[in-house]
């Protein structure tokens, strides 16, 4: 996935009100950018961090700049949670996930469950219809181990329960974690940060929901899904 226009670099001053960030650009300008991420962005908001932003002069936009990448631990990390669905689609179409090969139809944002929309729906294939829920991952606290979630996510647990219902109805329920950073070799559920989500994940896997984690390579030009990484046992829930 390529960024449509070259990104602009700068230094993060602060992130605040969840959706805003103050940035000093490399040319000296001080700007306020939109932050397309509703999560905590744990470990990614240190003042002084190198950041990269996209720019749009569309007249309807309140903020012309959008935060796309943060440098953390000498690694570029994608923070735009609007991109993982597109990255996941590209990963599936190029055969990066063999168990999702062979489907002739891929649809986006289809209604299902309890007033929800599934991110990707795969149909007309050699196996039952596959409902794919995509989650963005960018949290690391142990070298090499990417984790989800980085904060409590009741909505994420709800999606897991709906995938269980999908499996019970005879379809495939898929949880696909898109890791927007390259400095990891494995993935795990952070049960100590959200025990409720961890238990929901455990129930889902026991009920037949499938889970995959894909690592990405991030550059100033774009984000590319590169390979599957193994999913480890969850952190122990006290």
Curated annotation (Swiss-Prot):
SS bond partners: none
Pfam families, per the entry: SfsA, SfsA_N
InterPro entries: SfsA, SfsA_C, SfsA_N
A GO term, aspect molecular function: DNA binding
PANTHER family in UniProt: SUGAR FERMENTATION STIMULATION PROTEIN A
Recorded family membership: Belongs to the SfsA family.
Name this polypeptide is given: Sugar fermentation stimulation protein homolog
Native organism: Brucella canis (strain ATCC 23365 / NCTC 10854 / RM-666)
Originating gene: sfsA
């Amino acid at each position: 996935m390529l960024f449509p226009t070259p990104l602009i670099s700068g230094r993060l001053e602060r992130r605040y009100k969840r959706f805003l960030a103050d940035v000093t650009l490399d040319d000296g300008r001080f700007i306020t950018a939109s932050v397309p991420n509703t999560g905590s962005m744990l470990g990614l908001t240190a003042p002084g961090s190198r950041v990269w932003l996209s720019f749009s002069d569309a007249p309807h936009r309140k903020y012309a700049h959008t935060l796309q990448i943060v440098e953390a631990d000498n690694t570029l990390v994608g923070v735009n949670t609007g991109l993982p669905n597109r990255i996941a689609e590209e990963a599936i179409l190029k055969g990066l996930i063999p168990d999702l090969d062979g489907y002739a139809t891929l649809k986006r944002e289809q209604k299902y469950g309890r007033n929800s929309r599934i991110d990707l729906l795969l149909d007309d294939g050699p196996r039952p219809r596959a409902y794919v829920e995509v989650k963005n991952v960018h949290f690391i606290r142990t070298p090499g181990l990417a984790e989800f979630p980085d904060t409590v996510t009741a909505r994420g647990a709800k999606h897991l329960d709906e995938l269980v219902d999908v499996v019970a109805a005879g379809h495939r329920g898929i949880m696909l974690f898109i890791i927007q950073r390259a400095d990891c070799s494995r993935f795990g559920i952070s049960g100590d940060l959200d025990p409720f989500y961890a238990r929901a994940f455990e129930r889902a896997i026991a009920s037949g929901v499938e889970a995959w984690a894909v690592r990405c390579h991030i550059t100033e030009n774009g984000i590319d899904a590169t390979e599957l990484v193994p999913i480890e046992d969850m952190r122990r829930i006290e």
